[in-house]
UniProtKB/Swiss-Prot annotation:
Belongs to the intron maturase 2 family. MatK subfamily. This is Maturase K. GO terms for cellular component: chloroplast. Keywords: Chloroplast, mRNA processing, Plastid, RNA-binding, tRNA processing. HAMAP family: MatK. The gene is matK. It is found in: Plastid, Chloroplast. The keyword Acetylation does not apply. It comes from Tigridia pavonia (Mexican shell flower). Usually encoded in the trnK tRNA gene intron. Probably assists in splicing its own and other chloroplast group II introns. GO terms for molecular function: RNA binding. PANTHER family: MATURASE K (PTHR34811:SF1). Pfam families: Intron_maturas2, MatK_N. One of its GO terms (biological process) is mRNA processing.
Length: 522
């Protein structure tokens, strides 16, 4: 325990207090609310029931004044809870809802600024350059394509949510020693109407909290996941004969795309990748026997070693959650599978290993004989069932995959409808360019194309056949081109990463920095 304590204190030595006064600065809430300030850094603004920016700024000023008043926040939250429970929608409910959202967004902006400064300082100290070609989500698949061929076992791990908010506050306390700010956060989380139930009840409560407090929810969850992996590295160092001499670990930051290679040894490489935590985050390390990759709340643990080694790491995860985070996690949820007979879903692809059997005729002097060889091949395919499920939830088709019209888009112009469907189709083609089997992707494109035609026909109160016969089928052809022809319409074209001569099947592009919405919800 003393060694662990020293390990934690060493990495957390850089702390910056005095953040609490920033909650009373108007520009903090302007950063959280302004859509046009910098769309590449900040997420969508807080929706305030039709109020414009000037009115919202006035409300922020009133909020700051009321925070100064004693016991206001307590009464506001209590009023908000009662009114929501009773279904009342009046001025008090509006102000409380707005206050809750803005306080949540303001707190998240403050801590994001803190950790962004630390990240920039780390880059300057280590003289690390940001390689843009490593920003792409597809940059992980060549790694998997190269390493999985030689591994034996794999485990899917779903990282559980913490069961109590106090654990999250204690994690932040190790990084942010500003006591007033942490007390304010603790008070806000305790009094928020759905917080306690969100941590221990069905997914609906999690969904409500994450929707109303997106930035704060992501930051707290990623702080918890970062702490898990921080301790995981410690366990990795203690269990390895090839000790890591240095490493870096960051809380998942929005729009910081880096891949940092800290240490090269004869048989060891440790890599950290940070990505936009609203769409996907990579974090992985590898050594001769263990490989770990994570995307959001799902992790993949693969090994070249024995089943006993995988079992050891399985119980490392379970004990970490039970004894450090006080969360009871059943060990049977982590299943150990042989990679040769298992397919796993990761970042929009169904990945597996296929065995290729071939016979080679060998001739030596006057004798000839046949040699049977078996080679492994990395297979990444489009998960058709998952994508159809996402299309069904978005009301583009039925559960069985039958295309239907999109009623909510019938108020748009014809060009806007076609552009929306076309953009979805092109983005899917671009994102799944690495699939070795395109038949499933063609089916998804067909569903979107026919759904577009049905939507247009519904808007004009006609049938699909009559509508296409009147305007011509060429109307849709322009917007549903192949991925290679449509790249210039989406993003600046960049050189794809073609791995080991597999250009006919796997093409990994280096300009994909966000997960496709359909993939993210599948």
């Amino acid at each position: 325990m003393e060694e662990l304590q020293g390990y934690l204190e060493k990495d957390r030595s850089r702390q910056q207090p005095f953040l609490y006064p920033l909650l009373f600065q108007e520009y903090i809430y302007a950063l959280a609310h302004d859509r046009g300030l910098n769309d590449s850094i900040f997420d969508k603004p807080v929706e305030v029931f039709g109020y414009d920016s000037k009115s919202s700024l006035a409300l922020v000023k009133r909020l700051i004044i009321r925070i100064y008043q004693q016991n206001y926040f307590l009464s506001a939250v209590r009023s908000f809870n009662q009114n929501r429970f009773l279904g009342h929608h009046h001025n008090n409910f509006f102000y409380s809802h707005f206050d809750s959202q803005m306080i949540s967004e303001g707190f998240a902006i403050i801590v994001e600024i803190l950790f962004s400064l630390r990240l920039v300082s780390f880059f300057e100290k280590k003289e690390i350059k940001k390689f843009h070609h490593l920003r792409s989500i597809h940059s992980i698949f060549p790694f998997l394509e190269d390493k999985l061929l030689h591994l034996n076992y794999v485990s899917d791990i779903l990282i559980p949510h913490p069961i109590h908010m106090e654990i999250l506050v204690q994690i932040l306390q190790c990084w942010i020693p500003d006591v007033p700010l942490l007390h304010f956060l603790r008070f806000f989380l305790h009094k928020y109407h759905n917080w306690n139930s969100f941590l221990i009840t069905p997914k609906k409560s999690i969904y409500v909290f994450s929707k109303e407090n997106q930035r704060l929810f992501r930051f707290l969850y990623n702080s918890y996941v970062s702490e898990c992996e921080f301790l995981l590295v410690f366990l990795r160092k203690q269990s390895s004969y090839l000790r890591l001499t240095s490493f870096g670990l960051f809380i998942e930051r929005r729009h910081f795309y880096v891949k940092i290679e800290h240490l090269h040894m004869q048989h060891l490489l440790f890599i950290v990748v940070c990505r936009d935590y609203f769409h996907g985050t990579l974090w992985f390390f590898k050594d001769p026997s263990m490989h770990y990759v994570r995307c959001q709340g799902k992790a993949i643990l693969a090994s070249k070693g024995t089943h006993l080694l995988m079992k050891k790491w399985k119980y490392n995860f379970v004990n970490l959650w039970q004894y450090y985070f006080h969360f009871w996690y059943q060990s049977y949820r982590i299943r150990i599978n042989q990679l040769a007979n298992y397919s796993f879903y990761f970042w929009g692809y169904l990945s597996s290993l296929l065995k290729n059997y071939s016979t080679v005729k060998n001739k030596m002097l006057e004798n000839s004989f046949l040699i049977d060889t078996v080679t492994n091949k990395f297979e990444a395919t489009v998960p058709v069932i998952f994508l159809i499920g996402s299309l069904s939830k978005a009301q583009f088709c039925t559960v069985s995959g039958h295309p239907i019209s999109k009623p909510t888009w019938t108020d748009l112009s014809d060009s806007d409808i076609i552009e929306r469907f076309g953009r979805m189709c092109r983005n899917l083609s671009h994102y799944h360019s690495g699939s070795s089997k395109k038949q499933g992707l063609y089916r998804i494109k067909y569903i979107l194309r026919l759904s577009c035609a049905r939507t247009l026909a519904r808007k004009h109160k006609s049938t699909v056949r009559t509508f296409l016969x009147r305007l011509g089928s060429g109307l849709l052809e322009e917007f549903f081109t192949e991925x290679d022809q449509a790249l210039s319409l989406i993003l600046p074209k960049k050189i794809p990463f073609i791995f080991h001569g597999s250009h006919k099947k796997h093409i990994w592009y280096l300009d994909i920095i966000r997960m496709n919405d359909l993939v993210n919800h599948s």
